[in-house]
Curated annotation (Swiss-Prot):
Belongs to the UPF0102 family. GO terms for molecular function: nucleic acid binding. Residues 9-20 have a biased composition (Basic and acidic residues). Residues 1-20 are annotated as: Disordered. HAMAP family: UPF0102. Coiled coil: none annotated. SUPFAM superfamilies: Restriction endonuclease-like (SSF52980). This is UPF0102 protein Hhal_2103.
Length: 121
């Protein structure tokens, strides 16, 4: 049996492309990549970056159509809680200051929202 081919219509591939664009953009802004797709039982973080002495947990959102609402608004309470729990696991091993950012891509532009939300329990 042959593996299915991935195409530009594959949501996973589009998500990976959005994450790569976000990573390249943030590195261009002076941040350093610490980890990609950090997974725990509690959740996953798309990108973990360093901005000076601050650890930045980045949620990447791809929106194909502005009518679906803003990418930042799509990070609902449940998603914020999962991100917070995964971030706690990272910070248990790498203590320090941290913030949560959202990077939204629409295929052509990258929008970076620094300190998009606070940790939730």
């Amino acid at each position: 049996m042959m593996a299915p081919q991935t195409t530009r219509n594959d949501p996973r591939q589009r998500g990976q492309e959005a994450e790569e664009r976000a990573r390249a953009y943030l590195e261009g802004q002076g941040l350093q990549t610490l980890a990609r797709n950090f997974r725990t039982r509690r959740g996953e973080i798309d990108l973990i970056m360093a901005d000076g002495g601050v650890t930045v947990f980045v949620e990447v959102r791809r929106r194909s159509h502005p009518g679906y609402g803003g990418a930042t608004a799509s990070v609902d309470r449940r998603k914020r809680q999962r991100l917070s729990r995964a971030a706690s696991a990272w910070l248990a091993r790498h203590p320090g200051w941290a913030r949560f950012d959202v990077v939204a891509t629409d295929g052509h532009e990258v929008h970076w929202v620094r300190d998009a939300f606070r940790e939730e329990s």
